[in-house]
Amino acid sequence: MSRRHRAVKRQVEPDIRYKSPLVAHLVNVIMKSGKKNLAQRIVYGAFEKVSEKLEKGDPVDLLLGALENARPRLEVKSRRVGGATYQVPIEISFERQESLALRWIVDAASGRKGIPMKEALAAEIIDAYNNTGNVVKKKEDTHKMAQANRAFAHLRW
């Protein structure tokens, strides 16, 4: 990792159907081995299921609501001081909050065995939108860990 200068953030192209960079990011998180077409089918199928179940209109707005409930504000990073390693709580940027929330939603969906991925993804989005489920629990666990290690906040770098 070069320390000369920060890498330039590249713009994610909006997806074809919803014209949203957020949906394109979700597709990229789901994609494995370059199979973008399959990832798009999974995401669009999940959005159709979410629209059917919640009947609230635009699935992108529902995804935004789910992300708002799943987005962590703090996380802990290991910091070695002397011979001891401390878990230091730090605030995280909006981009990282969004990326973590999307990754957690996809991981929780793939953890639901026995049902197709598009249905699992739809269920996770609905659970996160309703402030329940594995993703919200993971966020709360992360916040609890940061709260428990608040005494080491002065070691922030």
UniProtKB/Swiss-Prot annotation:
Keyword annotations of the record: Ribonucleoprotein, Ribosomal protein, RNA-binding, rRNA-binding, tRNA-binding
CDD domains: uS7_Bacteria (cd14869)
A GO term from the CC aspect: small ribosomal subunit
GO molecular function list: rRNA binding; structural constituent of ribosome; tRNA binding
GO-annotated biological processes: translation
Keyword Ribonucleoprotein: yes
PANTHER family in UniProt: RIBOSOMAL PROTEIN S7
NCBIfam families for this protein: rpsG_bact
Annotated function: One of the primary rRNA binding proteins, it binds directly to 16S rRNA where it nucleates assembly of the head domain of the 30S subunit. Is located at the subunit interface close to the decoding center, probably blocks exit of the E-site tRNA.
Sequence similarity: Belongs to the universal ribosomal protein uS7 family.
Name the record gives this protein: Small ribosomal subunit protein uS7
Organism: Opitutus terrae (strain DSM 11246 / JCM 15787 / PB90-1)
